[in-house]
Swiss-Prot record:
Sn-glycerol 3-phosphate binds at T14, R84, E85, Y137, D247. ADP binds at T14, R18, T269, G312, G413, N417. PROSITE patterns: FGGY_KINASES_1, FGGY_KINASES_2. GO terms for biological process: glycerol catabolic process; glycerol metabolic process; glycerol-3-phosphate metabolic process. It is an enzyme of class 2 (transferase). It holds the Pfam family FGGY_C. CDD domains: FGGY_EcGK_like. ATP binds at T14, T15, S16, T269, G312, Q316, G413. It comes from Photorhabdus laumondii subsp. laumondii (strain DSM 15139 / CIP 105565 / TT01). Belongs to the FGGY kinase family. Glycerol binds at R84, E85, Y137, D247, Q248. One of its GO terms (cellular component) is cytosol. Its EC number is 2.7.1.30. This is Glycerol kinase.
């Protein structure tokens, strides 16, 4: 029998699909990545083509094995991690999507959310049972929108002809040739349709949104065998799909934040801060979400989460729209060309503001411009906005959990930016720890998949794989920290409530 030497993580993100092969020591052996199209039909609307998601993800899986010259029978299991909340509805018979995937960033259901909030007691019911706030970010109103706006969709859904899934569900369904319709607890907890206390779909919310239960996948733990997939067609080896977690929960697990009070921030397209609260679903009084995280064996734990909609995307904006930089990495170079932002604050509320403000009507703004402002000040202020938004969330989190973080673990593309990491530590007054393996999201999916198939014995074995590459410590005084942060709060207050409401 051929030795099962490797684990594969499929990382289906907002802008690209990736496949990553890891060995027993959690070293990355090979990575394959393919970008796909971002579709913007109207201002504030964001879509993906589900078939393109599948095409890019399946081809990276074949590519990554070929690139590393590894045969599929050497793979012990596959873990899937995915952009969360993004909503796909397809025909059960043909596997054909009836509409594009509506992406988590899409704000088209803002008015539908306003209407839901007007129903007596419903907003509080949703908050209490799903841990979420009523917001276009989550899948629930996206599902309703597709059923209401695609001809014949509601009738077909009621006849049981259609299936709904977040991206993980769609990938597993495609990988198993339509045999398996599942999701995991972490992804289900982001739909605004799932009761995080009794771990079941919430019939009252389904009724309010007129969503037939037959659309929904069955819900499982994040670390178990859901089904098998063939790589390389009929002759290929059947490999267990044995781990699923939404990208932020996967990153929390990959950073081994499996004890209550441990927290991480992922700096991707958006920024996502999660703090593990163990078996206690802590309710937030500060505009944060209560969500499901992975416990030591992939079982249900809870976490507080704050989502910042625009993190690394603001650096892309500097590059693609403003043309101030040629490459994302240039932002660090130009930011350090000036000694401070010269009083400039950039509030990148391009699609509204997430936690702790939850204002879909806020818009992007630049404040504090003077005749002496140059492009380097704007670049620096844009990077600083990522750190300020992180502090907004972290302050709320510490207040809710009644604890002070000793350190923040960080991952995602923007953590390579040393200026940003140092400023993050400065503005938090907290240690920032950057791991050797930056791919925490893929690592989490790999750990969950590997534990389910016995590739790693237990979490203790896994823990020896995570080492800190660099620690950033605060380098400014409290007075300066507070002065800078107060300026940020003033800027945010002015950016809020800009767009006309419906």
């Amino acid at each position: 029998m051929i030795e099962k030497k490797y684990i594969v993580a499929l990382d289906q993100g907002t802008t690209s699909s990736r496949a990553i092969i890891l060995d027993h020591d959690a070293n990355i052996i090979s990575i394959s990545q393919r970008e796909f199209t971002q579709i913007y039909p109207k201002p504030g609307w964001v879509e993906h083509d589900p078939m393109e998601i599948w095409a890019t993800q399946s081809s990276t899986l074949v590519e990554v094995l070929a690139k590393a010259d590894i045969s599929s029978d050497q793979i012990a299991g596959i873990g899937i991690t995915n952009q969360r909340e993004t909503t796909i509805i397809w025909e059960k018979e043909t596997g054909k999507p009836i509409y594009n995937a509506i992406v988590w960033q899409c704000r088209r259901t803002a008015d539908a959310c306003t209407k839901l909030k007007q129903k007596e007691g419903l907003e509080e019911y949703i908050r209490q049972n799903t841990g979420l706030v009523v917001d276009p970010y989550f899948s629930g109103t996206k599902v309703k929108w597709i059923l209401d706006n695609v001809a014949g969709a509601r009738e077909r859904a009621e006849k049981g002809e259609l299936l709904f899934g977040t991206v993980d569900t769609w990938l597993v369904w495609k990988m198993t040739q339509g045999r398996v319709h599942v999701t995991d607890f972490t992804n289900a907890s982001r739909t605004m349709l799932f009761n995080i206390h009794n771990l079941e779909w919430d019939q009252h919310i389904l009724d309010e949104l007129q969503i037939p239960r037959s659309l929904l996948p069955s819900v499982h733990s994040s670390s178990e065998i859901y089904g098998q997939t063939n790589i390389g067609g009929k002759g290929g080896t059947r490999i267990p799909i044995s781990g699923i977690a939404g990208d932020q929960q996967a990153a929390l697990y990959g950073q081994l934040c499996v004890q209550p009070g441990m927290a991480k921030n992922t700096y991707g397209t958006g920024c996502f801060l999660l703090m593990n609260t163990g078996t206690d679903a802590v309710r937030s009084n500060h505009g944060l979400l209560t969500t499901i995280a992975c416990g030591p064996r992939g079982e249900v734990n809870y976490a507080l989460e704050g989502a910042v909609f625009v993190g690394g995307a603001s650096i892309q904006w500097l590059r693609d729209e403003l043309k101030l930089i040629a490459d994302a990495a240039d932002s660090e170079y130009f930011a350090t060309k000036v000694k401070n932002s010269n009083g400039v604050y950039v509030v990148p509320a391009f699609t509204g503001l997430g936690a702790p403000y939850w204002d879909p009507y806020a818009r992007g703004s630049i404040f504090g411009l003077t005749r002496g402002t140059n492009s380097n000040h704007i670049i620096r202020a844009t990077l600083e906005s990522i750190a300020y938004q992180t502090r907004d969330v972290l302050d709320a989190m510490q207040a809710d959990a009644g604890t002070r973080l000793q350190a923040l673990r960080v991952d995602g593309g923007a953590v390579a930016n040393n200026f940003l990491m140092q400023f993050q530590s400065d503005i938090l007054g907290t240690r920032v720890e950057r791991p050797v393996v930056r791919e925490s999201t893929a690592l989490g999916a790999a750990f969950l998949a590997g534990l389910a198939v016995g590739y790693w014995k237990d979490l203790d074995e896994v823990k020896s794989k995570a080492t800190i590459e660099k620690e950033f410590r605060p380098g400014i005084e409290t007075t300066e920290r507070n002065y800078k942060y107060n300026g940020w709060k003033k800027a945010v207050a002015r950016a809020q409530d800009w767009e006309d409401k419906g």
